[in-house]
Amino acid sequence: MSSIYLDHNATTALDPRVLESMLPWMQRQSGNPTSRHVFGRSARDAVEHARTQVAEACGAYASQVIFTASGTEANNFAVKGIAGNQAGSQILYSAIEHPCVSRPARAMQQAGWLSDAIGVDAHGVLSTAQLQQQLQKPTSVASVMLANNETGVIQNIAEIAEIVRKAGAFMHTDAVQGLGKVPVSFTDLNVHAMTVSSHKIHGPQGAAALILDKRVDIQPLLHGGGQERGLRSGTENVAAIVGFGAACELAVANVAQFASHTQMLRDTFELGLKALDVTIFSQQSTRLPNTSFFALDGIEGETLVTALDRKGYAVASGSACSSDSTEPSHVLLAMGIKPDLARGAVRVSFGAHNTLLQVTDFLTTLKNEILRLKQLTGVAA
């Protein structure tokens, strides 16, 4: 039995065209991009071409792109690096951020910084009123994600950034889930720093970027050879960076088609969900077109995910980076969802290659598994 992949917010398959762009850098002698000989110059040219591709995909300048090994590294870099020059000030982050933003913010407390979470409403939308109140204290950086990896809710980052700028703080957004699904522009979002990642857009794992306004004074996390303008030391992963650039080019070219196709699949899926007595989260909000997050009262999300996996469908119970946790989704708790219902949450995230037939077949399987689990657990059908 072949499995159907419905977990594209976790990671995506490598596009064959991306792999083709990477192969020369994996199969033949590649120089160190800092070396001055012909092999090094060739590698440097490849990295700089990819830098331009990433910049163009993100509405930025190539000089603003700093390559990292992951979105987690880029987010840590933004939070710790920007705050690092302003000891004693506070770091703000939304209550629904990925742990690679919230945890470094909280970790900075041990070194003398303050950190605080900005609340969201019942639909997962950030409270700008609370943000304005919190900004009355001296603030170094505020980090609010463009699109949530669980609910898919899209924040009005340009509006939030304007509020943050007026308070004299720096604004960072984690745009990892947005790139390739919706138009993303560093300039239009009006932020000082933005994170994007390769493996969410059919590029290779091991490549990401922090896009940074060059006027921002940031402290490097890694010290060594001084690569990436002295801001991120370490020999560049040429093959992965080349793949990232190619993936960016393809993602931007296909973003409208992706959005139209996956929203059709998502809307069809959620129409079918209504007959299954489930709670669909954030339906009232502007969301990523491919994402549906729902829950069943009385059935653990992990239990349903495992049951569906056995039937050939790969879905998630929340963020892939914390899917081994038995705790309810911190995103749903921040939205005021009761813990018992939050524990029943399941995320489905569609991709460009999923089909309508797969959706209808999945709905049938989902209905059967829900009925079976309700009978086993004694939950009223």
Regions found by a protein language model. Give the residues of each.
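Pyridoxal 5′-phosphate
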Residues: M1-A381
